[in-house]
Regions:
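Gly/Gly-Pro- and Ser/Thr-rich, intrinsically disordered tail segments characteristic of DNA damage-repair
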Residues: 1-156, 166
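DNA-contacting surface of Y-family translesion DNA polymerases
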Residues: 109, 119-232
Length: 232
């Protein structure tokens, strides 16, 4: 897509991971000395070029790891004022994460923390990431009893750590020989807009196939409908 091509003017495909139809992770660590820019300056440069080329206003989250970058965009950026063009760029490191988000609620706002997990945590008096971090100091074994293997990543996230980087994501090999792309829409879409979404998802899959040097003979499309709007 045009937005993806804009990113490629600044970074290599090896340092970009399309996370969803409208979101990517970009590791700019090695590019900052080359461009003589801070992470904020480089993000702003790319965001403004996207705006100029497409008319689309992007939001960016900057973090010292993937998890913090995701939260900077998902949570922090939503609560800061936009500039004159509607652009929001937020930043987090481990210390600012603990200061700004350890008391944030609900826990479902945090990446990879679903309602089922939150329900289990709240049953044990854990309502915030700060609660979870403090509980883990002396109750790590108990968290594994409550959450199973998921406790490891949640404890890391509670402290603002993320052991997985771009290289690990790129080298991950799933047990099944397939790739997929999903999108949950926030409201009902008419046919013409839905077709555009499907086309954009197909383009993302095309980029991923090309990057992995793969070909396919089969494509499956699944569409779900919410009952309320189907009945209309």
């Amino acid at each position: 897509t045009q937005i993806y091509k804009t990113y490629l003017k600044y970074v290599s495909p090896a340092d970009i991971y399309p996370y969803s139809i409208d979101e990517v992770f970009i590791d700019v660590t090695g590019y900052l000395p080359y461009y003589h820019m801070s992470a904020h300056e480089l993000a702003m440069t790319m965001v403004r070029e996207v705006l100029y080329n497409t008319g689309i206003t992007a939001t960016a989250g900057i973090g010292t790891n993937l998890y913090l970058a995701k939260l900077a965009m998902d949570i922090v950026a939503k609560h800061i004022p936009a500039d004159k063009d509607g652009v929001r760029i937020a930043e987090l490191d481990e210390q600012s994460y603990r200061y700004l988000l350890w008391s944030h609620r609900p826990l479902t706002d945090f990446w990879m923390t679903g309602p089922g997990t939150v329900k289990k945590l709240e049953a044990h008096g854990i309502y915030t990431m700060g609660d979870l971090a403090r509980f883990s100091i002396h109750g790590e074994d108990r968290l594994y009893e409550i959450l199973g293997v998921d406790a490891e990543i949640l404890i890391d996230h509670a402290w603002g750590y993320e052991p997985c980087g771009m290289e690990q994501i790129k080298n991950y090999k799933p047990s099944t020989n397939s790739i997929s792309e999903g999108q949950v829409l926030t409201c009902p879409y008419p046919n013409d807009k839905a077709k555009l979404i499907v086309r954009e998802m197909a383009e993302i899959l095309m980029f991923r196939l090309t990057e992995k040097k793969l070909v396919t003979e089969s494509i499956t499309l699944e569409i779900g409908y919410d009952r309320e709007n189907v009945d209309k």
